[in-house]
Amino acid sequence: MADPNGRRRLPTGDPDQANASPSRRVSAVDGVTGGEGRPTYSHFPPGAYEPTDVAYGIRDAANDERARARARARHDQGGGAHDHHHDRPRQDQRGEAHLHDLPGEKSEVPDVGPSDQQGKEASDTDMAPLAALAKRSYDVNFPPLHEHRAAPFPAPAPAFAPAPAGTMGSSSAQVQGDGAPDNHDHDPRHLPRQDQSGGAHPDDLHGEKTIGSGSDILDDSKRGMINAGPQHGRITTSNGGSGSGSDKGKGVSYAGDKPASSSSSSSSAGQQGSDTDKTPSAAAASSYAVNFPPLLPAPAPVPAPAPAPAVAGAMGVANAHHKIALCSKWRKGRCHNGAACRYSHGEEEQRIVPEMRVGGGGRPCPELAAAKGWCRYGLNCKYCHGGV
């Protein structure tokens, strides 16, 4: 296929292309004008595709050296030259073998005649340093693609830390029949989810097998870690862990908390190492209930205290709804109620109600004008009491 840009006119502003003419062939790949001058790379972004002339010379020398070496090997084997189209390497626009088709392929170039063999052997010595330099330059500029393996996922830490010796029973691991320790319980795939306090969540233990013997037995240190939370580390038992089954741990109590139930106390007593008839689900449920107690309902609001009694008059009597009228018995000296009397004993204790003085019209009080000579309403009377 002909090069569509083979006879294009070069830009005239470049000093390296001052002598270019419309008839001069220009490569559409690297901008070199017939092997003369310096490459301008005007059609490439600056700084992206700008190899040096030395790199091109090294690549061309390596191509020639490898092509000659394969031709000599083919000729020495007596196979003759192959002119098949599929056995030839790809040719770039300058008629040279492509570098990517040469290493490791079966493509061959036509053998040269005996007359040119002496000249090629003489050039082998000159091209050997350039070929070595070209190989190093190609490996540096075009490194092979390596598959970056993902970093291995770190194994999770053991869910249960080993208990100190002598504190929570024996901490030795169970041994299988072949003498190897049983690592089934330490495998992260067989461990239930852990909440923030380290206890197993009961939802993950519904399908667990009943604790028995062999590899299914949890050691004492793990059982103790499941049943005892961080804030309930100290427990006291009345029977010291003696007995078996449901008879154990009935006297378990926590400092500062309410007495534990029979289920939680039984699971807590399992850290002594002899209780084997409790399932992990029951033990985890009791531990979860201890470490995460249910939210209690809000207490009933305390009723507000009764308001203070209203102050009536200058003496501050208790009953604010009375004391608006004078006590007739007190006037006669026969009232024995004292301060608890619902009427006022004098105008000093009388509670003033301005609404009671509306409607008198300024007329004199009829009770004062009568024979008894006093008014039971006192200061609250709507009539006039002699200038008051």
Curated annotation (Swiss-Prot):
Protein name: Zinc finger CCCH domain-containing protein 47
Region Disordered, residue ranges: 1-130, 144-282
Skewed-composition ranges (Basic and acidic residues): 61-109, 181-193
Pfam families the record matches: zf-CCCH
Gene3D superfamilies: 3.30.1370.210
Gene Ontology molecular function: any one: DNA binding
Comp. bias intervals (Low complexity): 260-274
UniProt key word Signal: no
Keyword Transport: no
C3H1-type zinc-finger residues: 321-348, 359-388
Organism, as annotated: Oryza sativa subsp. japonica (Rice)
Domain of life: Eukaryota
Keyword terms: DNA-binding, Metal-binding, Repeat, Zinc, Zinc-finger
